[in-house]
C-alpha cells in the first residue's frame, strides 16, 4: 500500500546518508559525478531494518542509458544498511539515479 512506502532525496553528494523509516521506498540520489569503475556508498537509516533482514534494491530511473550502474546492499545492521552504487558505463556520469528498496523480514 502507499502508506507503507516513502521517498527521500539525497542531499550534498552521492555518499550522503539518508533516513526513511518505511518498509519500502524510493531513494533519489544526488547528481554528483561518479567516475567509471568507481563506487559511491551511503547509509540508509531505517527503523524497519533488523540485522536478520534482506534489503532488495532495484535501479528504477534517473539513468540516461540503462545498464550504466550496479547497485547492491552491504553492511546490514539493526536500523541501517549501506548501499553501494557502481558506475560500469565506461565514462564519468552525473545522474540523479533512482533506487527502489524493499525490506524483507527473514527472522
Where are these regions (language model features)?
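Extracellular receptor-binding modules and their adjoining Ser/Thr/Gly/Asp/Asn-rich linkers
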Residues: 1-51, 75-107
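Terminal beta-strand-rich extracellular "head" domains
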Residues: 53-64
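Surface patches in mature domains of proteins
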Residues: 63-76
Amino acid at each position: 500500500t502507499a502508506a507503507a512506502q516513502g521517498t527521500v532525496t539525497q542531499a550534498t553528494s552521492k555518499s550522503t546518508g539518508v533516513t526513511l523509516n518505511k518498509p519500502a521506498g524510493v531513494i533519489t540520489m544526488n547528481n554528483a559525478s561518479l567516475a567509471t569503475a568507481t563506487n559511491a556508498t551511503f547509509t540508509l537509516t531505517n527503523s524497519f531494518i533488523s540485522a536478520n533482514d534482506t534489503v532488495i534494491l532495484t535501479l528504477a530511473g534517473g539513468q540516461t542509458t540503462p545498464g550504466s550502474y550496479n547497485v547492491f546492499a552491504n553492511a546490514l545492521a539493526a536500523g541501517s544498511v549501506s548501499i553501494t552504487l557502481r558506475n560500469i558505463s565506461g565514462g564519468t556520469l552525473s545522474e540523479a539515479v533512482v533506487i527502489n528498496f524493499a525490506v524483507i523480514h527473514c527472522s
